[in-house]
Amino acid sequence: RAAASIRAFFAYETAAGHLEASPAEGLRRPRQERRDPYILEEEEIRSFLRETEGSSAKQLRDRAMLGLLCATGLRVSELIALKTEDVDVQIGYVRQQARGQERVVSFDEELRLALCLYLESGRPLLLKEADEEHLFFNLSGGALSRQGVWKMIRAYGQKAGIAGEVTPQSLKNSYAVHRLLRESRAVKQRAVRQRSGGR
């Protein structure tokens, strides 16, 4: 914006005859260095989620929401669009639609219990309309916004004392990285067992 303002000022001065040529000619907006999203270590993810622990309706909601983001790699837009029918807390999976395709992602016992607690003790206290189908909503019973969830993530990241900036994209990338690492370890372990069994 500063560069554009400078160019506009000198263009006006040139047009008014105060200058023969604009000294800002050729001035371009400086390129901003693009930073890759921060990848959280597994201990940082645990610290991040610990900040949501508590028994209030808001804490139960936040633990379930952020736990889902960390454990499934969902986008925020996908998270806030979830309906209660999309989550099976008995088996432990979430079903979501992405680009016309259905994706089913399983989650662990810890998150299953967090979701059960939210559905039993948190969601009923936040619910304003009996026929509300969405899984999560704001404290007024209305729809969650992407910006609201983004602010929540950043606030919990700061409370946890995480050095890097915690954003929805960093949580999604962290999920992908740690999933690949787990799969790589599993492949190596299978290879070791196969070699051991062949001796």
Place the predicted regions along the sequence by residue.
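Conserved catalytic core of the tyrosine transesterase superfamily
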Residues: 1-199
